[in-house]
Amino acid sequence: DWSSDVCSSDLTSETIMISLYPTIYHTFQCKADRCENTCCQLWTIDIDEATAERYHTMTGPLGESLRQAITVDDEGSHFVFSKEQPMCPLLNENGLCKVVLELGEEGLCDTCHMHPRFYKYIEDLELCGVGLSCEASVELLAEDTQSDQVIFTIEDDDGEFSPDERLTIQNIFELLAFDIDSSYFQYSPNPDVQYYAKLLDLYGTTEPIDEEWTTQINILSHDTGKLITAVQSYIANHDMGLFNKVFQYILYRQIDMLADYSLESILSYARDGVEYILITSVIEGSPLKQVARWSQQIEYDEDNVELLLQHYDSLQ
């Protein structure tokens, strides 16, 4: 498969691990109670077995609160939030986690401790990052207005690479033995009626995160001609640097999917993603919120990612 093809002597040996990090990874910090769109809501959090055992046997008021918050089924222990109770019951009145306040971050389950960090692997290459569903991640990505490129650091076990070395997304593909023209890594908006109609139809087939997602798709599909005019005006009056970085970051997160899907499919996935973010930014405003919203709907639903990539593969 593709994974074994790219792992040449330049990349790996029996003992070497190479880790890549977007620079925002190193400065990321949870906003906690300052977050307007907390991750402590509206989804199911799987609790690892070791932490679940500790929670179930913990004494005192915190232990009681934890047991009341946990749902147990055949697949294990979970924190389950619903429309009726969207927020984690372990948040105090100030929006701070009771577990962290009493036990520190090491008291969290693996999912809560790691989120929104992600790690993907291609043989001995480790792709690290922080997910765009988190507003703190998106804000960090947007902070550097002097560049429209995502910059990465590289670390390896044997010191072959300098800690001061900086890479672009193109350099990463070169590490993987892909010789691709730099133009493929630059996002170019494509306000076109037929393209937008197909994009909205396709996104309408994804499993919605909530009713608002479906409503938004329907509204955007109502008059694509007017939508094109609005997008063209936005492009003429706004810098596209953030959208280019988002495009590269979306692409980076799915590099490991090249084991199962074509490069063209991965590029289409990233292009469509950032085009949809552009569209919603034009209509709804708040581009940073639109990035996080898209990520929650698409990136954090593996079924939706697979659905889209299978669609793009079927077109070739």
Which residue ranges define each predicted feature?
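Membrane helical hairpin/interfacial module
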Residues: 43-86, 90-94
